[in-house]
Amino acid sequence: MGFHDVKRSKSAKDTRIIAIINQKGGVGKSTTAVNLAAALGEQGRKTLIVDFDPQGNSTSGFGIEKEDLEHCIYDALLNDVPAESLVLDTNCKKVFVIPATIQLAGAEIELVSAIARETRLKDLLEPIQDEFDFIFIDCPPSLGLLTINALTAADSVLIPIQCEYYALEGVTKLLESMKMVKSRLNKGLDTYGVLMTMYDSRTSLSNQVVEEVQSYFGDKAFKTLIPRTVKISEAPSFGEPVITYAPQNKGAKAYMNLAKEVIKRA
């Protein structure tokens, strides 16, 4: 079944295009992209993930073998392959992905001399975006041209922050980049929400980070906290989200609650 055959939610509003972004690695960007998309699919929202990270974790997170792919997002960015032909079905209902492979790493350099280099992603998503309730762009852990493309294509950002020392380190730099893109390339760019990941209620550090983030971001901080669980870490090696791998796990339940908050803000 092609993605055209799957219907959007009956209560659908405009498509939301959300860049999941934090230039720090290991904060749960791809984990959030995969599990939030799966949770939204379970709640009837047709969702697309654009894997924009050369590591391709959002691609392998659905059990897609990157070695078997003929094309990936790189080909749409630089070889004019239409995005429509890159959309793959996943093992989760109503969830689709445009995959990434390590080939995407070369795009940073190749985009430098490209015409309309900042708007490549925006332009290639335009013909298909109305097909979906939500589109998530899983950004690379850097603030280069790929990330600028993501910020130009998105209407808002979701920032995952790990509950650890120096949690807010680097966020200031990210907000500066957003401000620059907003003033020059994408006037409507906004913060959709800030998500705290790898939360451990037993440690005072986790609770301290939650307080810091909530006081810094106010009501932009999601109420749902994503716990640190073995099942969340384990699920990608089985090629599926924790939502389907261990639906009763507290991590899966947290992502289902997060999806409700995301729908409410749409």
Language-model regions: role of each:
Residues 1-266:
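P-loop NTP-binding core
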